[in-house]
Amino acid sequence: MKELIIGSHVSFQRKTQLVGSVKEAVSYRANTFMFYTGAPQNTARYPIDDKLTQEGYQLMEENGIDPVDVVVHAPYIINLANTAKPDNHRFAIQFLREEMDRCAKLGMTRLVLHPGSHVSQTREEGIQNIIDGLNQVLTTEESTYICLETMAGKGTEIGNLDELKQIIEGVEHSEYLKVCIDTCHLNDAGYDMTKFDDFLNEFDEKIGIDRIGCVHVNDSKNVCGAHKDRHENIGLGTLGFDTLYKIVTHPKLKDVPKILETPYVTKEDNAKEKVYPPYRFEIDMFRNGKYDPELLEHIRDFYK
């Protein structure tokens, strides 16, 4: 059986860039990772350093990480779904194009994008706005796929399977579109993750299973259909370890990178500040196929 392709969100810092990202991923015993090329919540971007990129690739090769499996996440501030302020929509299109170019410079082939929220406009208008935006971004020759993320349906978010199907069908160069399925978002949107084969069948029927380009692996703090989007550590939420393990090891997804975006852990139960990354331990649980009931204690002991 092919080795599990699993990693987590890691940082991408100005001074170390890809080198720092790879080192962090390796410290979690991961064989893939996901990063933002700058801050997710603003437009500040610094130039990609070719030397650091080259060193990062060397480190990946030394540590068994295939660059094809590495994922970039587009910043949250890109909202293609709303055109109430045309300047903002034009900016979102331009900024997404720049992110695609940064991915190309880094040699990254997967860019995850939140489809957006229609806000004051109708859902249908929002979907059409996304289609129009993607048609302006995507050209005939891209080296990076945009992976549209399944969303929880919070507020006016767009991103259930029917909406993603409509977007993909409306985009001219849809050969460059894939989907990132997020287990927490799907649960919160009302899809039953305990019946994952049924979900995959529905996905295959509506979109095509070959379009799955990434899996965000998160437990959820909420019940199915809550439309909330609050991630929880693996095994501590409403989905549970067994359900997530079946998804992560599903044979139809064996070639798809799995990325953890679970919350950092506090120093003690009642503390508020989350300081310890859980990923090394959550990855180990999935590799071993066994839930650790003392997960939080082991994370705290390791980092303190």
Regions found by a protein language model. Name each.
Residues 22-29, 49-71, 97-107, 135-142, ...:
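Acidic (Asp/Glu)-rich catalytic clusters
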Residues 131-234:
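Acidic/histidine-rich catalytic cores of soluble enzymes
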Residues 13, 259-277, 302-303:
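A short, acidic, flexible beta-alpha connecting loop/helix-capping segment that sits on the rim
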Residues 9-13, 38-40, 75-77, 116-118, ...:
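Active-site beta-loop-alpha junctions enriched in small/polar residues
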Residues 1-72, 80-98, 289-304:
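N-terminal pre-domain/capping segments
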Residues 4-10, 31-35, 68-74, 111-113, ...:
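Hydrophobic faces of well-ordered beta-strands that scaffold small-molecule active sites
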Residues 16, 61, 79-178:
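Active-site acidic/histidine proton-transfer and metal-coordination neighborhood
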Residues 86-98, 123-136, 160-170, 197-201, ...:
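Short, electropositive alpha-helical surface patch
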